[in-house]
Amino acid sequence: MYAIVENGGKQYKVEVGHLLHTEKMNGVAQGDKVVLDKVVLVKTDDGKVLVGKPYLTNVTITGIVVEHARARKILVGQFIPRKGHKTIKGHRQWYTTIKIENIEIK
């Protein structure tokens, strides 16, 4: 069974036991339970597909926050020709890792 869930403006495919790397979720600590309720699609083990318009109200996905961490550094550069000017900046995006515990259809 798998589901497609929306979180942080993006859609992710999740299965029970998998780790989900999503945008940083403020207000939750490591070890807290999280309920993802914006479920777009669910495919059950017997092949049945449930599609929401836009979301499924009878499906909830629960998980546990594993960690808050930062991604690899991305370098952004600017070069102005004939002036000898160069600028390089770095950015590391925060993300939250969630372990999916259960996909429940009510």
UniProtKB/Swiss-Prot annotation:
GO molecular function: rRNA binding; structural constituent of ribosome
GO cellular component: cytoplasm; ribonucleoprotein complex; ribosome
Signal peptide: none
Coiled-coil regions listed: none
Subunit text: Part of the 50S ribosomal subunit. Contacts protein L20.
Family label: Belongs to the bacterial ribosomal protein bL21 family.
Source superkingdom: Bacteria
Keyword Lyase: no
SUPFAM superfamilies documented for this protein: L21p-like
Function in brief: This protein binds to 23S rRNA in the presence of protein L20.
Alphabetized Pfam families for the sequence: Ribosomal_L21p (PF00829)
Disulphide bridges, residue numbers: none
Protein name (record): Large ribosomal subunit protein bL21
Keywords assigned by UniProt, alphabetized: Ribonucleoprotein, Ribosomal protein, RNA-binding, rRNA-binding
InterPro entries listed in its UniProt record: bL21-like, bL21-like_sf, Ribosomal_bL21
PANTHER family xref list: 50S RIBOSOMAL PROTEIN L21, LARGE RIBOSOMAL SUBUNIT PROTEIN BL21M
One of the GO biological process terms: translation
